[in-house]
Structure formats: C-alpha cells, structure tokens
Amino acid sequence: MSFLNVVLPLGSSVLSFVFAALVLDQWWQRRQSFQLVWAIGLVCYGLSTGAEFLGGTLGWSSSIYRVWYLFGAFLVPAYLGAGTLYLLKKTRFGYFVAASIALGGLFSLAATAKYPGSTGGGYTALAVALVAAAAIATATALRREHQAHVAMAFLVAGTLVVAGLVLTAHLTGRYLDSATHVPVAAAFPGYLRVSSVPFNAGGGLALVFGALYSAYIYMPKKRVVPARMGALAIIPNFFASLPGAVTALIQGKLNSRVPATILIAVGALVPGVTSSLNRFGVTWSFFLGEFLGLVLIFVGFLVSEDVFRNVRLGTTLWSRAPSASLESEVG
C-alpha cells in the first residue's frame, strides 16, 4: 500500500467536505441555485475520494468500488458543471452545454469499439444525450432562464438510472492497477463505461469553459471580432484580451475574479486530464490530479466574490464589500 495512495485521497476528501460546508453556508445566506448544486458536486467529490481512502486502508470491497465509480465517474463532473450553468443562466451558455453533451454522446458511441458488448449502451447514451442536448438548446433559445432547470431535470433522472445500474452491475476483473494500486473501472461492464462519457464531457467542459467565460467577462477586452458575432467572437477576443489582462494584473488593476476563475478552470482541467489518462492505463497521476485540481478550485473560489462574500464558522470571520455580481454583469 503506497503512503500517497492513502494520504492524497484523504486530503481530497476532507477538503471536499470542508469546501462543501462553506458553499452550503453561502447558499444559506444568499440562496443562489448554483451554490447548492456546486455543494452537491463537492459532496460527491468527497464521497468518491473518501471511497479511495477507505479502499486504500481497509481494502477494496465491491461496495467501496461501486461508490467510487458512481460518484467519481458520473456525478462529480456533472453536478459541478450543472452548477456552472446555473451561474450563467442569464447567458446563452446553454448552447455550449448542449453541444458538449451531444459530443459526449458521440464519444460514447465511438468508445464501444474498445468495449465488446457495449454497442447497445453506446447507442442508448447517444440517443439520451441528443435528446437532452436538444431540450437544453431549445430552452436556451426560448426561455433562457429555464436552461439550467432543464439540464438539472435530465441530470437528476440520469443520476437515478446510473445509480441503479452501478449498484447492481455484475463485476468481473480487477479493481486496481497492478503496478500503482490505483482504482480502475475495468471490473464494470462496457455498457456502463461508455455511458459515463456524456456526464464527464457535459459537466467537465461546462465547468472549465464556464470559468474561462467568466474570466473573459471581467477582463479588460480587446475586440478583434465584433461582439455582434456572438459566441464566435468570444474565443478570439478572449485570447486577444489576455495581454491586456496580464498588464492589468501587474499594475494591480485587474478584477480579482479574473485570476480566480482561471484558477477554477485550471483546477477543473487537471483531474479531468488525469482521469482521462486513467482510462488509458496511465494511473500514476490519478490521486495527485484529484488533490491538486481541488486545491486550485478551492483557492479560486475563495477569492471569487460570486461564491464567497464572507467566510463564517458560526460567526463571520472575514468579509468584503459587495460589488457587481457575475449574474448582473451577464444579465
């Protein structure tokens, strides 16, 4: 048993639950939907990494293994991404989320080539992903304020379905990588492994690019593409604006939300990359990626007023004066 295989998951789990408690406290004060959904995602993070800690110390039972896979592979990225969509519910970000979910469905179908007997699961995942994507895109076009609710309805239904599938699936094969003793999904049937892709793609991409979009909103902008081009203008204008943002940072004039949201984006990307590598047999970085990613997100959220206006442990320990919220900036 590797020392780091116990310490890193324990650190990730403890930090996740502390983080979730702080976000829940903020939700109690402000009653913003994105905070509640993010807190759910962080609890899922804590349960998944807690299962890794228990598996590393007590041994991997089928129950611990199922908890790890359900929360880690399906629910963590999905709920954190859904929280981001709630934060950006006054924008047209639902189009991006819809495209990400549809792309995840296509990747599910493509992944069936790697897992024999998973073709039915791949086609089912693709069909459900396309229906969800169409519903979210339609809500974004017709009633923008409902886009996050539509996505959440599909996510809750999907959570119930995959929970039943994961908890009852027949397990065959190894739970751990033989060299690094890191958990791998090899014991689960192929149809479940391909079904996790839309949850990961939709949620993970929403969290990463939602944070980058939030950074773009607050940074000093250089528009090389007219704003009337809509979403097509965001990417080139974002990169064109980066030098000005760096200059403003050096001069101490940059809105603190810009580095905060970039930290969140990088923090979301790190475990996404290491989890993807885990799927392809590169397992040594898995626990480290989970921990470092969570630390970066935590630091980013701490300096982001959109989440933390004050920090309390029974009483207010630290606070700052309110300024324009992200929702008001994009509304």
Q: Where in this protein do the model-derived segments appear?
A:
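Membrane-interfacial loop-to-transmembrane alpha-helix junctions, especially the N-terminal start
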Residues: 29-42, 92-101, 148-156, 254-263
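Individual alpha-helical transmembrane segments in multi-pass integral membrane proteins
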Residues: 2-16, 32-134, 287-295
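C-terminal transmembrane-bundle signature of multipass membrane proteins
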Residues: 207-218, 241, 245, 249-331
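Extracellular-loop-to-transmembrane junctions of the mid-late helices
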Residues: 4-12, 115-133, 137-216
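C-terminal ends of transmembrane alpha-helices
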Residues: 46-58, 108-121, 163-187, 268-280
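Membrane-helix boundary/juxtamembrane motif in polytopic membrane proteins
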Residues: 142-160, 192, 212-266
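Juxtamembrane loop-transmembrane helix junctions in multi-pass integral membrane proteins
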Residues: 2-6, 26-29, 33, 60-67, ...
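Alpha-helical transmembrane segments in multipass membrane proteins, preferentially the mid-helix core
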Residues: 18-23, 79-86, 132-146, 200-227, ...
